[in-house]
Amino acid sequence: MGVQGFQEFLEKRCPGAVVPVDLLKLARTVSRQQQQQHLHRQLPPAALAPGAPRITRGSAPLPPPPLPPAAFGAYSGGAGPSRHHHPAHHFHHHGQAPPGLHPPPPPPLPGARVLVDAGSALPRLYGGYQTDWVCGGQWNAMLGYLSALCQACAYPGGDGLELVVMFPGGLGKDRLAEWGRRCQAERQTAQLIVGHVGNKGTPPPRAWFLPPACLSHCVRLALIRFRVKVFQSLEDHHLEVVAFFRENGFHGLLAHDSEYALYNIPSYYSSHALKLSWNGKNLTTNQFLMQEVAKQLGLKRMNFPIFAALLGNHILPDEDLAAFHWSLLGPEHPLASLKVRAHQLVLPPCDVVIKAVSEYVSSIKDPSNLDVVGKDVFKQSQSRTEDKIERFKKAVEYYSVTTKLSSLPVGPSFLGFRNNRLGNPPLPRNQMGPISPGKPMFSRQVPQKMKYPPPFPMGPNSSLLFSHSVGESHAFSEDAMLQDNSFANWAVSYDSNTSQFPNCLTSKTSPPLGPDSSHSSSSDGDEANGAGSEQITEAVQQQPGWEDPNGDRGAWGQPADAGVSETTVAESEPHIPSLLSMSTRNHMDITIPPLPPVAPEVLRVAEHRHRRGLMYPYIYHVLTKGEIKIPVCIEDECNMELPPAALLFRSARQYVYGVLFSLAETQRKMERLAIRRRLPMEVPSVILKEWSAYKGKSPQTPELVSALTFREWTCPNLKKLWLGKAVEDKNRRMRAFLACMKSDTPSMLNPANVPTHLLLMCCVLRYMVQWPGGRILHRHELDTFLAQAVSTQLYEPDQLQELKIEKLDARGIQLAALFMSGVDTALFANDACGQPVPWEHCCPWIYFDGKLFQSKLIKAGRERVSLVELCDGQADLASKVEKMRQSILEGVNMNHPPPSALLPSPTFVPPMVPSLYPVSLYSRAMGSFPPPPQARSRGFAGLHPIPPQGGKLEIAGMVVGQWAGSRSSRSRGSFGMQVVSVGGPGKGHGKEQAGRGSKGHKKGNKQGSSDVISKAVELHQSRARSQVNGNNGTLIVEEKSDPLPAPSQCALSRDSNECNNSDDHCLPVKNGEKNHVPEQELEAVAQQKEE
């Protein structure tokens, strides 16, 4: 887009507008100015009388009173920026002094503060573009760089620079087209990287930098460790960064995004040019002087919104402006001949467009009349002219939001953020009462967001807010510290229906859910997500299927917002190819069924932790929108041995979805309700959308994925999982996490086998080992992961920097990328399950280094060294590796069968049209585990469907009757016939014979057999009704199938016993298990018929 190329244009074409600066010197200058202003305000009137000494420019200021060590700036102790210092703490400690001896020292003056956009500054926060990133990440080197950066900012004497980092946490649905193009470019870059490493064995060039998997979360955890204030955006990241910048009075913005240059930011610094000196005394970068930029372009600052709208952006893309851009160049331009290429859309170069558009904008007589400007811009357009003009006006208004106003108001935002799933204005704070049982709280309106308390202490054993409930005063009360906190207002409610900014950020692509799907719940802790069984029944009965919640049903292959008619698409412009007349939204969204209701307490906690950067960013969006975006990692699309990361860890994400929506308890409640009402009821599947890009999968369309439940036990609801304080709740959190990662075995929680800080790594490796599509990790590769985790070199980044690797291993690079993608999924599962693993044990720098892994993999693979040599000759480390390997491989069948002919993964399931394959098979595109059957009705014995292969009845070995199946088997293999045997060799057990049945005994008494069958079935059904879900009256026909491996003992067996006290729904019946048929009853019927 033209906007994205604006920053590069500034750096190359506007040399006078880019000046080098030292941020640390600027911070000290700001601090001295604030001290002088503070002393000038405190001087008595006598000091200002004639003849009194005054502070003039160039003279030394009066010495300030001595400050306590705790008041030196925003950072203390040299350990990084302090997140907990507040003047109230100082007065509390020094308030015991007798009055008159020592006056209370003044509060520390706020130093310079810079807001960092982590979305565009990740390469610099990682430590630069060093070449070792291709190995999977050198996390201890990154940790050392961030530590040096924080110590350099903590300048002694109160003249430090405070850094506040904002991470992107929104889905960015309005920028999906831009995200899709970026994913395609990253996929191409990944292929270049893999090819370069495979051919030359050297690191790729710096220009091919691709962020290592899980980089954003690793940087976030590292900043939390150094007590840097961390926040996450919720919807539109750019506008929220600007709003946060304005509301909290920052002195500068450090980023690398062209849109910030057009947002009228007072002090905009380049994160791309950020450099920290080796001694930590200088932190240099480039500052963009936008006043000089406007002067060189001949523009006024007030015309920047129109200029940005006409460059091409996510609202009005380049394709809609191509004809306008070519018309500005004119036929005499040297590049004019490029636009006449046959059937191909060609765009002018970005720098040429910027010059031409700036000249056009400067010539506009009345910039306020957007209708006239829009008609003039699109006067050559022959299709969708009105739509283009409307998009142009929305783009102008989008960029005018932060340009016209000097500061953003506090309260309902005019930015049009969609902060809730209903899209309605929030309730006023005075109308928020206590949550009453059974009363719908989110029926039509969402409560206003709570204000953020000061950052919470991060002790060595903290669990990041998962030890208290929402209603406790110490967690969410507005105390004195909160009132003076500069970030206290960063929880203002954003309203999408305000008149100041009419919803230009929203689109009908993902409409907010209607009142039918609103959150209604009670505060009873035993209810799943706070919803009672009666409410679940009503929700299921009234739930529309594949339907637009707003009433508009989506077509089969058309998104809900694609309002382009056939006649419009058929039109084309004479000179520009037909792409200009088509819809520019080149991604297809799909409307999913309404999500299950989520308790208000859970949503408030999720949003709070999301805003504070204390939670995986997509958990809130899964709960509210049912969507997630999966980043691209380094994958060789020509290598068929290793699956894509998005498919490899999809099963774990599906289990996480089931945990987040409390699917297990919902199923159990539905089954209880079905038993009570004596009606069969199916639990509706929870469908979510995953946006990803890998081989054979375009990022333009999402994949529909269903949530799964654990087969072994019933996971508690999310409210109890997050806010429960009992010891059993902590055990259930850990078991839920282990079950999501398929690592629920006793040895995983045994510190003698798996050290506590290596639990998350071992869970990821065990998950990768269990991939049924083929062997991902060989023996020496698994040992390499474990050996580098226990190596002492892991904590020596200086030695690793000097480590030389002759030739990089291409497979090792892909394995490292898969592993770090698994760490990313494990962080997602850990946060969703209530963070049973403390955040200190989740950080990858305590168990992985990409360069160290490469060096040891070469030794183990090429040189074939022993395990002791792989562990640097230390036998004790080798024994640790062996114990961890045994724990990882416990109960795992390493002899994987060859993958069968698997069904192709459909790119999407169109609304209102049933799929050719069931949703449960979507995750099996590359041979993943077949998920357990969803929505099984286990409540009624005897109500079994007629087998499709038919069956026959044998009495004393004689066939007395046969019946046809419900449908043909369609030649999908030899399915055995169902055989019900009474007496004889079968001894009353249902059995199945291979093929179509034996050739003998074809003749029989048809009439007699039908009577016997009808009476037997009638008696059996009456017996089943009298013993609903009983044990003696159940008829389960044994089918011939491969027996499932015996489940290994769970890590927390006590919980599995406790969850089965009330009913027998926790452990489903597996194939191969036999339930005895009441042979006495069937024999009695048969004997009576023979008589």
Curated annotation (Swiss-Prot):
Highest taxon above the source species: Eukaryota
Keyword hit for ATP-binding: no
Modified residues (Omega-N-methylarginine): R57, R972
Compositional bias per record (Polar residues), positions renumbered to this chain: 532-544
Residue numbers spanned by region Disordered: 35-105, 503-575, 966-1010, 1037-1077
Compositionally biased region (Basic and acidic residues): 1062-1077
Homology family: Belongs to the constitutive coactivator of PPAR-gamma family.
Protein name: Constitutive coactivator of PPAR-gamma-like protein 2
Organism, scientific name: Mus musculus
Gene: Fam120c
